[in-house]
Regions:
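Radical SAM/AdoMet-radical enzyme domain recognition
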Residues: 105-110, 128-136
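Short loop-beta-helix segment that forms the pyridoxal 5′-phosphate
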Residues: 2-26, 40-43, 62
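Active-site region of PLP-dependent enzymes
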Residues: 120-126, 133-187
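PLP-dependent aminotransferase-like
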Residues: 28-92, 96-117, 124
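Short active-site oxyanion
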Residues: 11-12, 36-37, 152
């Protein structure tokens, strides 16, 4: 995790069992509630949608660009409603989505951005590592991805306000991380 923190210039790195697990953590940390809408590309792996459906969200699929196979940034705004809570750009094959436009829309409508960068390790958008531009970035280390470990993933984010909840989620509802740091006597 220290390598990722330095290499990608990100404050928080949580190694996970998979990108699916990282996406599920990001959905929880984004406070996705039943009835919320989450915008994502129509072309993605099922885990991208499942992570948010498990929280009760309604998925709003948006068409992709034929030149990149990524979400068409020009179609996102028309999909936004008063129930929209997040945008999930998927960086297909290491090709970055148009994050400047996506971040502008997120700011305009006060939406979370969860980057599915499963295929984006060591890929960049205007000098920034994919997965470090939005609120959360999710990576995969599955055998079919850029960096492989057989399985595994990572959740990254900049804001320290999510750290404690992320630690508790990863540690199955306990404050085990605080125990290892000597901040509590037991967990």
């Amino acid at each position: 995790s220290e390598w990722m923190r330095k290499r990608f210039d990100v404050n928080q790195v949580f190694l996970t069992t998979s990108c699916t697990h990282a996406l599920e953590m990001a959905a929880f940390l984004s406070d996705i509630q039943p009835g919320d809408e989450v915008i994502m590309p129509s072309y993605t792996f099922v885990s991208t949608a499942d992570a948010f459906v498990l929280r009760g969200a309604r998925i709003v699929f948006t068409d992709i660009r034929p030149d990149t196979m990524n979400i068409d940034e020009n179609l996102i705004e028309q999909a936004i409603t008063d129930k929209t809570k997040a945008i999930v750009p998927v960086h297909y094959a290491g090709v970055g989505c148009e994050m400047n436009k996506i971040m502008e829309l997120a700011e305009k409508y006060d939406l979370k951005v969860v980057e599915d960068a499963a295929q984006g390790v060591e890929a960049y958008y205007h000098g920034r590592a994919l997965g470090t531009i939005g609120d959360f970035g999710c990576y995969s280390f599955h055998e079919t991805k850029n960096y492989t470990m057989g399985e595994g993933g990572a959740l990254v984010f900049q804001k320290s306000e999510y750290q404690e909840k992320a630690e508790i989620l990863r540690e199955k509802g306990t404050d085990r991380s605080k125990f290892f740091r000597g901040q509590v006597d037991k967990y």
